[in-house]
Amino acid sequence: MTFYDHTAIEPKWQAFWADNHTFKTGTDASKPKFYALDMFPYPSGAGLHVGHPEGYTATDILSRFKRAQGHNVLHPMGWDAFGLPAEQYAMDTGNDPAEFTAENIANFKRQINALGFSYDWDREVNTTDPNYYKWTQWIFTKLYEKGLAYEAEVPVNWVEELGTAIANEEVLPDGTSERGGYPVVRKPMRQWMLKITAYAERLLEDLEEVDWPESIKDMQRNWIGKSTGANVTFKVKDTDKDFTVFTTRPDTLFGATYAVLAPEHALVDAITTADQAEAVADYKRQASLKSDLARTDLAKEKTGVWTGSYAINPVNGNEMPVWIADYVLASYGTGAIMAVPAHDERDWEFAKQFKLDIIPVLEGGNVEEAAFTEDGLHINSDFLDGLDKASAIAKMVEWLEAEGVGNEKVTYRLRDWLFSRQRYWGEPIPIIHWEDGTSTAVPESELPLVLPVTKDIRPSGTGESPLANVTDWLEVTREDGVKGRRETNTMPQWAGSSWYYLRYIDPHNTEKLADEELLKQWLPVDIYVGGAEHAVLHLLYARFWHKVLYDLGVVPTKEPFQKLFNQGMILGTSYRDSRGALVATDKVEKRDGSFFHVETGEELEQAPAKMSKSLKNVVNPDDVVEQYGADTLRVYEMFMGPLDASIAWSEEGLEGSRKFLDRVYRLITTKEITEENSGALDKVYNETVKAVTEQVDQMKFNTAIAQLMVFVNAANKEDKLFSDYAKGFVQLIAPFAPHLGEELWQVLTASGESISYVPWPSYDKSKLVENDVEIVVQIKGKVKAKLVVAKDLSREELQEVALANEKVQAEIAGKDIIKVIAVPNKLVNIVIK
């Protein structure tokens, strides 16, 4: 039986594409543009897994589709190659992280090329290449010049095992580090910060301009966390001190019965009384060991210590004890809160635990039993009594401003971005600290500031990066003899990935980040495909940098990515025992359709789970390509289900996709191809062109493949295949299975040219409608014949055709026809006796 020999055909076409630079980005200014971007990978030692190609295949199908539709297509790939794993490997082995990274990139590239993706490799970028990070450093110097990069002594999330501080976004909900799962402690350190907060409102507003999943927009909105309310100033009794509180509910001020400061608040030591000093100091020490997420966990037990001082409630003169508690963060709001325990669950629990007053100021609920957190009319609130929430807030803000003890205020949950890392394998921050106390940016003419090669890359232990050990790089002298030290912190991995999509547009430019005209031509990115796990971090950082570059006149658009699509996760197969514990696949055997533990004999339940090394359920694309072919892997991953769904990997599904491609190969190579159109496939062919065109455009790849299958089934029923339909079908399947598409195109045309730029097939609307219909002929209410007739025949014509039919004539011979009822396009009913 004829079958598709992927082992010969796929390498042949991969070599053809490489030799002919088939996918070089088009530059014809008269054509529309299409910029299809993948989230570039970190080139790990493990190589690609089958989850990577899912998103890559989607953008590749779109890129091939748009090329055939006459677009200039920019479809690049590169490497997000700085980062901790390479440094960790280097420390463990003594090898240079650059060598390890280069080997990993070569392996990733081999794997990617084996999958037939149509990348323009002339535009490849690597974030660890000095010619690339020259411009990462240049962007940093611009941030510095604009006052958006600054140094501050800040409590950081310090991870002892990693020897570095990490950003808030990299701390998991359980208070451990995203990388490695290590404990995170709070520690004050000199750090570089980026003032992303200066862009909070624009980052929020401009989400309206982009076509992104609403869930991702919501995650960014929540992270930015805009709140409108009021600042209220509280004086500390018997002192000249005061503190400010931000509240979204100034209308509940009459119910504020105590205040809470963050343990790190600057006022704490100044207002703590002598008899409370030891307890306060102990509590501050304990709080410093917890991450922000652990401190604000709603489920945790409430802890706190009284400072011994009282604040004066400005609205009624009542004394309010001032406490410190770790659920209040110095970095959020003003680092101080007014507690209204009657109407806030956390304040209520705290008040109950420490026997503090609870005064209801909203009607409804029983505050002895629980906090009342719904809306109600105001009570116990003097001039606010009887007012609803909106009216009371407005009136209280007016009162605060008139009395000079508060004002209306908008705040954001978003914090400035902690940008420095105490590691070696990252972009050096281009700043020099001089002995006269000044700091300057490295001039543009001296960029890139190249990372020095050194064997000594262990963390210094002092909080500085290993670069502090490289004396000849570290120490510099100015023309006037003043000595200086280079900044030893390096940039986080997020730096290079915050702008890489811009460098793809003009990757070899030595004079500037990218040419303005080219940026105008290609921005914004038309489709960006990647995992939803980057919803806040990477996407927010990239949007921030893009807006800064927009303000500098470097880029012409406010937003970088017009449309974002998150592919789902490809899950592996896992097995669970009766206790619910996961069992590795090499400990499982299949018998009679059931699964059993090899050692215990216990029957196991099969369930999908994230692929992991420990479960031994990771599928390597190399193995799939070798056994089934790249086209099979591509078609299978697109046919599994909707692109954004998480679906379990299945060998049976893979085999089904391979059989489909074999059927396609046989159809084109063994069926007689004719120049005459019998018309039998008119409708299904035109339906297929229409459906595949629309569904690819909407990224509904699974339903597009289903329609291709419909055509193959219909075509296989015919003796011959019309040449134009054969060619059109091959064009439709080529974006999904490009090696097969190229091979079959040569079978049909022998053109010697790639199918890639052959204009996409069009469909004939008139052929979508059936020209013939089947009608039934009933005699005495029973169906006696079925006739295929031209559509829309008149009653008279229909009657004539029915009565002329041989079967009908045999039934009515010798009978009297009483009447004939003809319903066009449906039936003919003959009444006889």
UniProtKB/Swiss-Prot annotation:
Catalytic reactions of this protein: tRNA(Leu) + L-leucine + ATP = L-leucyl-tRNA(Leu) + AMP + diphosphate
Motif 'KMSKS' region per UniProt: ranges: 610-614
CDD domains: Anticodon_Ia_Leu_BEm, LeuRS_core
Pfam families: Anticodon_1, tRNA-synt_1, tRNA-synt_1_2, tRNA-synt_1g
Top-level taxon in the UniProt lineage: Bacteria
InterPro entries in the record: aa-tRNA-synth_I_CS, aa-tRNA-synth_Ia, Leu-tRNA-ligase, Leu_tRNA-synth_edit, M/V/L/I-tRNA-synth_anticd-bd, Methionyl/Leucyl_tRNA_Synth, Rossmann-like_a/b/a_fold, tRNAsynth_Ia_anticodon-bd
SUPFAM superfamilies, sorted: Anticodon-binding domain of a subclass of class I aminoacyl-tRNA synthetases (SSF47323), Nucleotidylyl transferase (SSF52374), ValRS/IleRS/LeuRS editing domain (SSF50677)
Single Gene Ontology BP annotation: leucyl-tRNA aminoacylation
EC number(s) reported in the record: 6.1.1.4
Subcellular location: Cytoplasm
Enzyme class, broadest EC rank: ligase
Listed GO CC annotations: cytosol
Keyword field: Aminoacyl-tRNA synthetase, ATP-binding, Cytoplasm, Ligase, Nucleotide-binding, Protein biosynthesis
Annotated binding of ATP, by residue: 613
Chief location category: cytoplasm
GO molecular-function terms, A-Z: aminoacyl-tRNA deacylase activity; ATP binding; leucine-tRNA ligase activity
'HIGH' region (motif): residue ranges: 41-52
Family: Belongs to the class-I aminoacyl-tRNA synthetase family.
Protein name: Leucine--tRNA ligase
Originating species: Streptococcus pyogenes serotype M28 (strain MGAS6180)
